[in-house]
From Swiss-Prot:
Residues 335-352, 427-447, 514-527, 615-630, 871-894, 909-920 have a biased composition (Low complexity). Its main location: nucleus. Plays a role as an alternative splicing regulator. Regulates its own expression at the level of RNA processing. Also regulates the splicing of fibronectin and CD45 genes. May act, at least in part, by interaction with other R/S-containing splicing factors. Represses the splicing of MAPT/Tau exon 10. SUPFAM superfamilies: Surp module (SWAP domain) (SSF109905). It comes from Mus musculus (Mouse). Keywords: Acetylation, Coiled coil, mRNA processing, mRNA splicing, Nucleus, Phosphoprotein, Repeat, Repressor, RNA-binding, Transcription, Transcription regulation. The modification Phosphoserine is found at residues 283, 601, 621, 829, 831, 899, 903. This is Splicing factor, suppressor of white-apricot homolog. GO terms for biological process: alternative mRNA splicing, via spliceosome; mRNA 5'-splice site recognition; negative regulation of mRNA splicing, via spliceosome. InterPro entries: Surp, SWAP, SWAP/Surp_sf, SWAP_N_domain.
Length: 945
């Protein structure tokens, strides 16, 4: 739980800068404040449920039982139980001081400005103000002189086909400039209806009046906030100086603004423009006749003066409000006028006259309320904003809505420029009434309601993606429950439009319709499932190949057949079928989700292909049609040879991939085995080196390092066995101490040593009976442990007796340096006694020291008056050299240590002869094995190179 930084103090000063103490000071002055902070690391665990509860405010409780004020348990307001002392009506300054009406109004405005950000998005408001400001600028620029970008077709542009005569264009330009100057500098005369006070100055020119008038009109419509914005934006524009309070035209501006608010003033600029429009046609014709000799400009190239693009776009969509009081009367009159006429003798229903479209303004407006879809279908326009969709389409005029009564066809107006399609019952008079009845009754409940422009691109895009990726994509999107894709639900009002677009894109993705011209055309929506299911199952022949690409999406208009579909009219097109064989690449995307590797079952592959092809074709919605009837799916028909070829190709690719993976796995396995073999060889060589030469730990470490170099070159030093003794190996070993590795003394000397040891043992037993019981069992057990294993395997065994015998003086400071240099991993035994056991042979110099120490121990054993303190003083170097390996047992007494050391020496010399013979045999066997392994490794290296 606690991190590495736990408990770390961070001294800081209040001001953020730590003050350093002076050279003589202690740093704890009165002006210095320290903050001691202890930090501990902690883990944070993700708890989604707790986070969701916090976000929903489930941890909040009502304050004092008031559900309007919710606080958490750490809120300081929990300590307040009564706020009556702080209520505004009792304790505010306004209790004694009553504001006047003007002051209260100003205070209310100030409060509104203070708390504006609480209930208003300031960024959105600023963007709206910018937009309104742009509109004002455009309105100010539309005074007839110029637009945002004006047209100039004068002599400034060189035309090589025209003679270069500049006299007439220059005269015309001067004339136009004079007219503009006259218009702009025309003095302003107040109109008769405008009674301007005598103390208010009038603007000098008509242009200045127009600017003031438009600004006042704009501020009246948008609010006083825009006046402040205009004043700030146009601070450097001299034309808007009248907005300043100290300007002489500001009273006139305020007067015009007040008159507009009261409705006593109409904008003069608009009335002038209306007069110009009325008198425009006659005067324009005369001017055109006069100016034909000049530079003629076609009327379509003129800049539009007062026409708004937004109004043009919205004009065809104007519909009478169905909630209007007069709308009920209009609908009643239309229902009376468009009542079904008695059918004629041949059974065809009576057609409503063309007068119905123009007689009423509502029907005339609805004539244009549609838009055409890419496949020839046209839908009714979306309702105007603020009107419910269901009520709008249910309360449409009778001349436009669908009648479900038998014998009455729909009267949806056709697109402009085309005639209304003929009724479908003219061909067969006997069965016409029944067919029309079934169609209209089946299609009446569902109507394609076009979505508004902000939702329509989303629906179109999703329908296209579903047609391309299959129904699984639609299911996954629906499962997310996103608000933007609610139209995927069957109960949604735009679901019919979505299904229609999906079917349209499916036909487009499938390469177009492949039905014959003689079969009845299917309706594009799910509402005509009964007819389309029956006709589609029989109609499309199976041998028809899929048209390649998407080229057959182009259709030509047919002559007589069309399906009248409520608010959806489908123009009839005769499908053109090209028997072009589909390319291999066009069919490959159907096999995206292919089979697993090494799966050879053809049945599984075929079932997967069928499943993928069905997922890419949309099924009709179950809400609109009975589930037993299914629409025929248009999937591409592949021949048996193509399927077999593709399956064989896929199997071959799968097998190749599996073989490549197996090869890679085998290669990696072989490389790992080679690495393991090399590691084993290195360890075996190192182990044999330690068997042949039981070196001290430092030399073992050096030897291990040198074996890496030996392995790389492939050369292994092979020790020679001469007379059962191992000759020294010179490679990789320091040449300083050769006497430690050779067995120079012959067998006779060893026998003499054994005899001397027996004599010493008898003396120690007789002279020191006190320590007999403690030294004897230890020495015996130790000798047993020694003889139970060869000396080669006793590299890590520690001696129990820690006696400091004089023989340890042979370990010089050089040995200590080697022990320090070797890493701890190689220092398996830290006691010098263990290393002494490994090196059984000693140099003649060491033997002399040994004999002297023996004579000293004999003398000390005879005279027991020697104190331990003197012994410690006599051997300071040995004690200091091996202080790391001395245990607390040594404090028992120097005599006990002496007896243990002597017994250990005797045991070591007795076992030396036996150990040497056993070791030589083991070494011979192991060296034979090593030579065989080295020969094999050399062969491997040569073959690998």
């Amino acid at each position: 739980m606690y991190g590495a930084g736990g408990g770390r103090a961070k001294p800081e000063r209040k001001g953020g800068v730590k003050e350093e103490a002076g050279p003589g000071g202690t740093g704890t002055g009165g002006n210095r404040v320290e903050l001691l902070v202890f930090g501990y690391a902690c883990k944070l665990f993700r708890d989604d449920e707790r986070a969701l509860a916090q976000e929903q405010g489930q941890h909040l409780i009502p304050w004092m039982g008031d559900p309007k004020i919710l606080i958490d348990r750490y809120d300081g307001r929990g300590h307040l139980h009564d706020l009556s002392a702080y209520d505004a009506e009792y304790a505010t300054w306004n209790r004694d001081y009553q504001l006047s009406e003007e002051e209260a109004r100003v205070e209310a405005l100030c409060d509104e400005e203070r708390y504006l950000a609480l209930h208003t998005d300031l960024l959105e408001e600023e963007a709206r103000q910018e937009e309104e400001y742009k509109r004002l600028s455009e309105a100010l620029a539309e005074d007839g002189n110029y637009s945002a970008v004006g047209f100039t077709y004068g002599s400034d542009y060189y035309d090589p086909s025209e003679p270069t005569e500049e006299e007439e264009p220059s005269k015309q330009r001067e004339k136009n400039e004079a007219e503009n100057l006259e218009e702009n500098e025309e003095p302003f005369i107040a109109p008769l209806g405008l009674s301007v006070p005598s103390d208010v100055e009038l603007p000098p020119t008509a242009k200045m009046h127009a600017i003031i008038e438009r600004t006042a009109n704009f501020v009246c419509k948008q609010g006083a906030q825009f006046e402040i914005m205009l004043k700030a934006k146009q601070a450097r524009n001299s034309q808007f100086d009248f907005l300043r309070f100290d300007h002489y035209l500001n009273p006139y501006y305020k007067f015009i603004q007040k008159a507009m608010k009261e409705g006593r003033y109409t904008v003069l600029a608009e009335s002038k423009n209306e007069e110009k429009k009325k008198s425009g046609p006659t005067s324009d014709n005369e001017e055109e006749d006069d100016e034909e000799d000049g530079s003629y400009l076609h009327p379509s190239l003129f800049a539009s003066k007062k026409s708004s693009r937004l109004e043009e776009l919205m004009k065809p969509l104007k519909v009478v409000d169905p909630d209007h009081p007069l709308a009920a009367l209009v609908r009643k009159a239309q229902a009376d006028s468009s009542a079904p006429a008695p059918p004629t003798a041949d059974g065809t229903p009576a057609q409503p006259s063309q007068v119905e479209y123009t007689a009423d303004s509502t029907v005339a407006a609805m004539y244009y309320s549609y838009y055409m879809l890419p496949d020839g279908t046209y839908c009714l326009a979306p309702p105007p904003p603020g009107i419910d969709v269901a009520t709008y389409y249910s309360t449409l005029p009778a001349g436009v809505t669908v009648s479900s009564s038998p014998g009455v066809t729909t009267t949806v107006p056709p697109p402009p420029g085309t005639t209304p399609p003929p009724p479908p019952t003219t061909a067969e008079p006997s069965s016409g009434v029944t067919s029309t009845t079934t169609t209209t009754s089946a299609l009446a409940p569902v109507a394609i309601i076009p979505p508004p422009p902000d939702i329509q691109p989303v629906i179109d895009k999703l329908a296209e993606y579903v047609a391309r990726n299959g129904l699984k994509f639609e299911t996954s999107v629906r499962a997310k429950n996103d608000q933007r894709f609610e139209f995927l639900q069957p109960w949604h009002q735009y679901n019919a439009y979505y299904e229609f677009k999906k079917q349209f894109f499916l036909q487009k993705e499938g390469g177009g319709s492949t039905q014959a011209a003689s079969t009845a055309e299917e309706a594009p929506t799910e509402t005509a499932v009964e007819e389309s299911g029956e006709a589609g199952e029989d109609g499309a022949p199976e041998g028809m190949a899929e048209t390649g690409g998407r080229g057959s999406g182009k259709k030509e208009a047919g002559s007589s057949k069309s399906t009248v579909d409520g608010k959806l009219v489908k123009a009839s097109f005769a499908p053109i079928s090209f028997a072009i064989k589909a390319k291999e690449n066009d069919l490959l995307p159907l096999e995206k989700n292919r089979v697993k590797l090494d799966d050879d079952s053809e049945e599984d592959e075929e079932s997967r292909e069928c499943q993928e092809s069905t997922s890419s074709v949309a099924n009709p919605s179950p809400a609109a049609a009975p589930p037993s009837v299914a629409v025929e799916e248009k999937k591409p028909q592949l021949t048996q040879e193509e399927l077999e070829a593709k399956q064989a190709k896929q199997k071959l690719e799968d097998r190749l991939a599996a073989a490549a993976r197996e090869k890679l796995a085998q290669a990696s396995k072989e490389s790992k085995e080679k690495q393991l073999q090399a590691e084993r060889k290195r360890k075996a060589a190192l182990f044999l080196q330690t068997l042949k030469n039981p070196l001290p730990e430092a030399e073992v470490g050096k030897l291990e390092e040198s074996t890496f170099g030996v392995e790389d070159t492939g050369v292994m030093p092979c020790p020679l066995l001469v007379g059962g003794r191992t000759l020294p190996i010179l490679e990789g070993k320091p040449p300083e101490r050769p006497s430690n590795r050779c067995r120079d003394p012959p067998r006779e000397e060893e026998r003499e040593k054994k005899k001397k040891k027996h004599k010493k043992r008898s003396r120690t037993r007789s002279r020191s009976p006190k320590y007999h019981s403690s030294s004897k069992p230890r020495s015996r057990s130790h000798s047993k442990a020694k003889h139970s294993l060869p000396s080669a395997y006793r590299t890590v065994r520690r001696s129990r007796s820690r006696s400091r015998s004089p023989r340890r003086r042979a370990h010089s400071p050089e040995r200590r340096r080697e022990e320090r240099s070797v890493p701890t991993a190689y220092r398996m035994s830290g006691s010098p006694g263990v290393s002494r056991k490994r090196t059984r042979s000693r140099s003649p110099h060491e033997k002399k020291k040994k004999r002297r120490s023996r004579s000293r121990t004999k003398a000390k054993a005879r005279s027991q008056s020697t104190s331990p303190s003197k012994q410690a003083a006599q051997r300071p170097s040995a004690h200091s050299a091996h202080s790391a390996s001395i245990s607390p047992v040594e404090s028992r007494g120097s005599s006990q240590e002496r007896s243990r050391g002597v017994s250990q020496e005797k045991d070591g010399q007795i076992s030396s002869a036996i150990v040497s013979s056993v070791q030589s045999k083991i070494t011979q066997d192991l060296m034979a094995k090593v030579r065989a392994m080295l020969a094999a490794s050399k062969n491997l290296q040569t073959s690998a190179s």
